[in-house]
Amino acid sequence: MDFLLLGLCLYWLLRRPSGVVLCLLGACFQMLPAAPSGCPQLCRCEGRLLYCEALNLTEAPHNLSGLLGLSLRYNSLSELRAGQFTGLMQLTWLYLDHNHICSVQGDAFQKLRRVKELTLSSNQITQLPNTTFRPMPNLRSVDLSYNKLQALAPDLFHGLRKLTTLHMRANAIQFVPVRIFQDCRSLKFLDIGYNQLKSLARNSFAGLFKLTELHLEHNDLVKVNFAHFPRLISLHSLCLRRNKVAIVVSSLDWVWNLEKMDLSGNEIEYMEPHVFETVPHLQSLQLDSNRLTYIEPRILNSWKSLTSITLAGNLWDCGRNVCALASWLNNFQGRYDGNLQCASPEYAQGEDVLDAVYAFHLCEDGAEPTSGHLLSAVTNRSDLGPPASSATTLADGGEGQHDGTFEPATVALPGGEHAENAVQIHKVVTGTMALIFSFLIVVLVLYVSWKCFPASLRQLRQCFVTQRRKQKQKQTMHQMAAMSAQEYYVDYKPNHIEGALVIINEYGSCTCHQQPARECEV
């Protein structure tokens, strides 16, 4: 538009006297964008872009005009005063992150109408006036993350119809005002993660028809109601990781195009049976590290488009209600973490869910959960309230509110006696199989040795034969020695003659009388 006016001005001046032409021509040239003045000391200039970074500046440089971009990152700015950037009417982006800014006046960005990108992250801002962004209607991206914002002014984002990206991560925000984003019709990315949100109002996100990604992770939310996200028809990704959510419900029956949902790291114990019927296009779901004990068959039926799911780290009850989940996992063609462990009952603690179903014959009187039979083994719950216990009593032949996929049936769950018998049988079978396996290994080793090392086996056999022969020789010698000793004592006959014995020496002779021997009883 400026160039069109300039052309008309020149055309009109060419038809006037020369003096008038020169005067008016000078006035017209003042309408042109001013060239940037000299580059401030220690700053870096690249054409009409100025970078004054990490210089410990406490104020913005003065006498700057004609700039298209200004970066004052990593300095020591503490306050943004009214009219501080008045001369930068051509500015399109402004970086003020990593300073010590704690106060922003309402008219600090006056006359910065052309700014499209504003970064105020990593400062100490505690509040922003309602009129902070009013002078910048062309904003596309605003970064307020890593500050100390505790509350948001109700009209803070009023008039920002071109805003597409908004970062408010890692503040201390406790509440999102109703319809605060009403004018942000072009917003596609919104991050309010790592704050202190305890609840959400029903119309907090009203007007965000083009929003595709919403981050609410690491807050203090205790309940998720899908009615809090009305008419977010373009939303594809919702992150609610690491909150304190215990219940997931949906009080509005409407369909949205959500494809990815992260609910991991919460305290979820109950989900309404129809809660996922409002997201028929859901492809990725994270439910790991919660307190789920079972999943309703109606919920499993609504997971028709899933290609990825995580369920580990929950308190799975491997009892009456595990059959539907086991069958669904058997038939699931996508990716899942595969580390689902039983938390109860006691005899199944620590076992993999699918292994427990097979080992303890939990479903259909011991039948294995295959080919979708298990999904019809559990009756759909008719009530929508939280379960009184993880093992809900099923009525024989009763009819619940269901969508026609599951048929009512009874599930045989082993009692205490049957469970103990099953455990004992399982141990006996396991021990027998281990023994047979060990025997087969020994036979295999002998067979391989006989085939591969025949000479060694012959030597080993000769050693055994020689050793046995030596043992026999020793036994024979011992027997012969014992027999000779017995014959010596049995055949002994004394040759002495009863009477006097005369011993003669050089001094004379002695006479002694030998008495016959007597046997004494001992």
Curated annotation (Swiss-Prot):
Stretches for region Disordered: 382-401
Principal location: membrane
Cytoplasmic side stretches: 449-522
SUPFAM superfamilies given in the database record: L domain-like
LRR repeat feature ranges: 64-87, 89-111, 112-135, 137-159, 161-183, 184-207, 209-231, 233-255, 256-278, 279-302
Phosphoprotein among keywords: no
Extracellular-side segments: 35-427
Gene Ontology BP annotations: establishment of localization in cell; exploration behavior; locomotory behavior; long-term synaptic potentiation; negative regulation of receptor internalization; positive regulation of synapse assembly; protein localization to synapse; receptor internalization
Lipid bilayer topology: Single-pass type I membrane protein
Keywords, alphabetical: Cell membrane, Glycoprotein, Leucine-rich repeat, Membrane, Postsynaptic cell membrane, Repeat, Signal, Synapse, Transmembrane, Transmembrane helix
Domain LRRCT: 314-365
Domain LRRNT: 35-63
List of glycosylated residues: N56, N63, N130, N380
Pfam family, one: LRR_8
Transmembrane segments: 428-448
Top-level lineage group: Eukaryota
Tissue specificity: Predominantly expressed in forebrain regions including thalamus and cerebral cortex.
Keyword Transmembrane: yes
Family membership noted in the UniProt record: Belongs to the LRRTM family.
Note: This gene is imprinted, being predominantly expressed from the paternal allele and showing a variable pattern of maternal down-regulation. May be associated paternally with handedness and schizophrenia.
Job of this protein: Exhibits strong synaptogenic activity, restricted to excitatory presynaptic differentiation, acting at both pre- and postsynaptic level.
Entry protein name: Leucine-rich repeat transmembrane neuronal protein 1
Organism: Homo sapiens (Human)
